């Protein structure tokens, strides 16, 4: 099993297959525009710029499940990310990451890489690093800075 069997809708409402990312290392992150950790967007964009030419992708999944910190429409989210952080990596439409309506890729990621207490996502900016075969490799809590993920990206890109 891998992420390649799943699809998502991008922020513009277009269907995207994870299969289109085959052979790339992917970081999947649930995001929010009005969170104390929103500054992670800056570090995520830096990671993307540093590694995009090496077969690395980031997909941000806006989510309003934690403190209702992503209340905006798709256009508002896109505008916020562009104006404040110059985000050039992919964003999805707003999704849920926990509960019965959790996006299928999040159901899969959580079943493969559990958190400290259980499989649920605890907060915004939880990160999942997926290897170039589409297999979940490592889960990072919200408090892990994007910069601190670099050694793991290097390891996976080196293993390609």
Protein language model features and the residues they cover:
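Chalcogenol-based redox active-site neighborhoods
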Residues: 1-160
């Amino acid at each position: 099993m891998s992420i390649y069997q799943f699809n998502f809708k991008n922020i513009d409402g277009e269907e995207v297959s994870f299969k289109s990312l085959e052979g790339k290392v992917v970081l999947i992150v649930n995001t929010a525009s009005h969170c104390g950790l929103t500054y992670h967007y800056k570090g995520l964009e830096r990671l993307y710029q540093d590694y995009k030419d090496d077969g690395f992708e980031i997909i941000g999944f806006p989510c309003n499940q934690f403190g209702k910190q992503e209340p905006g429409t798709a256009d508002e989210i896109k505008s916020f990310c562009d104006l404040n952080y110059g985000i050039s990596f992919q964003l999805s439409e707003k999704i849920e990451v926990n509960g019965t309506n959790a996006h299928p890729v999040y159901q899969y990621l959580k079943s493969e890489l559990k958190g400290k207490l259980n499989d649920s996502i605890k907060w915004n900016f939880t990160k999942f690093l997926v290897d170039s075969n589409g297999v979940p490799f490592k889960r990072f809590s919200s408090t892990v800075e994007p910069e601190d993920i670099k050694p793991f990206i290097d390891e996976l890109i080196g293993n390609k």
